[in-house]
């Protein structure tokens, strides 16, 4: 029962995070950058470096493999629709990205630096400073990334691009972005002033989706579950 409650709470958190990023996916170019050509100093990147590109409300990460290749985790609905590599290897568009997030379909793929960054400025190994963790040797980082290439389940909270690079770089998958969002939601739900807002949100969900039992129960119980798991 406890696991079911946590799964329901997890699902709500993911949907909230998805909604918060919906505008980003809708109005930005693929990957969230400007799409404009940007002169990248590829020769300054070392195999195994973590490349980081800032977005409006989130950050995207990848592992540099050398020879203008970056391994990164990307949601892509096309992976569930076809096995044609010629189609799936093309740069992931917004029309493929958002449905991929919703359906939790993704892959760890290799793109050029330009396609990965899509016009955004690149930071190199910035996570080393922000996380204050000792990194593995660059060659080991790159090997780990190469071993992960291929299909992977996607989760905004538990298996995103940041989890991928931190596993490769430090040996354990973590995502400060997801953790920060998770803590923020717990604080809001735990705050008594948010109880009414949570109830209204549940009521709106029921009205919008209908009174189907599979939606009614989560809409009523999830705010309570979140409060219970806030410890």
Curated annotation (Swiss-Prot):
Activity-regulation annotation: Inhibited by all-trans-retinyl alpha-bromoacetate and N-boc-L-biocytinyl-11-aminoundecane chloro-methyl ketone (BACMK).
- Residue ranges of the TM segments: 195-215
GO BP terms in the entry: cellular response to leukemia inhibitory factor; lipid storage; maintenance of location in cell; positive regulation of lipid transport; response to bacterium; response to retinoic acid; response to vitamin A; retinoid metabolic process
Q: Which residues form the active site?
A: 60, 72, 161
Give the record's family classification.
Belongs to the H-rev107 family.
What protein name is recorded for this chain? Lecithin retinol acyltransferase
Gene, per the UniProt record: Lrat
Query: What's the source species for this entry?
Result: Rattus norvegicus
Q: Which residues lie on this side of the membrane: Cytoplasmic?
A: 1-194
Q: Where in the cell is it found?
A: Endoplasmic reticulum membrane; Rough endoplasmic reticulum; Endosome, Multivesicular body; Cytoplasm, Perinuclear region
Q: Give the metabolic or biological pathway.
A: Cofactor metabolism; retinol metabolism
Entry keyword set: Acyltransferase, Cytoplasm, Endoplasmic reticulum, Endosome, Lipid metabolism, Membrane, Sensory transduction, Transferase, Transmembrane, Transmembrane helix, Vision
Q: Which Gene3D superfamilies match?
A: endopeptidase domain like (from Nostoc punctiforme)
How does the protein's chain sit in the membrane according to the entry?
Single-pass membrane protein
What the protein does comes down to: Transfers the acyl group from the sn-1 position of phosphatidylcholine to all-trans retinol, producing all-trans retinyl esters. Retinyl esters are storage forms of vitamin A. LRAT plays a critical role in vision. It provides the all-trans retinyl ester substrates for the isomerohydrolase which processes the esters into 11-cis-retinol in the retinal pigment epithelium; due to a membrane-associated alcohol dehydrogenase, 11 cis-retinol is oxidized and converted into 11-cis-retinaldehyde which is the chromophore for rhodopsin and the cone photopigments.
> Record's InterPro entries?
LRAT, LRAT_dom
């Amino acid at each position: 029962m406890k696991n079911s409650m946590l799964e329901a709470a997890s699902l709500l958190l993911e949907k909230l995070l998805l909604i918060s990023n919906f505008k980003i996916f809708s109005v930005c170019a693929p990957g969230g950058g400007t799409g404009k050509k940007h002169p990248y100093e590829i020769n300054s990147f070392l195999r195994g470096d973590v490349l980081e590109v800032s977005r409006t409300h989130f950050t995207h990460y990848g592992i540099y493999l050398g020879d203008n290749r970056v391994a990164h985790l990307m949601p892509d609905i096309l992976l569930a629709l076809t096995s044609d590599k010629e189609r799936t290897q093309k740069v992931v568009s917004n029309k493929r990205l958002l449905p991929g997030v919703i359906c939790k379909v993704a892959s760890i793929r290799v793109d050029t630096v330009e396609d990965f960054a899509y016009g955004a400025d690149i930071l190199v190994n910035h996570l080393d400073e922000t996380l204050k963790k000792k990194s593995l040797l660059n060659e080991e980082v790159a090997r780990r990334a190469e071993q992960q290439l291929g299909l992977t389940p996607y989760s905004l909270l538990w298996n995103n691009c940041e989890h991928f690079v931190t596993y490769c770089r430090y040996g354990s998958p973590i995502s400060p972005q997801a953790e920060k969002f998770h803590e923020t939601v717990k604080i809001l739900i735990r705050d008594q002033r948010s109880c009414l807002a949570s109830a209204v949100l549940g009521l709106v969900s029921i009205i919008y989706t209908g009174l189907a039992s599979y939606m009614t129960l989560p809409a009523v119980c999830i705010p309570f579950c979140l409060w219970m798991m806030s410890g």
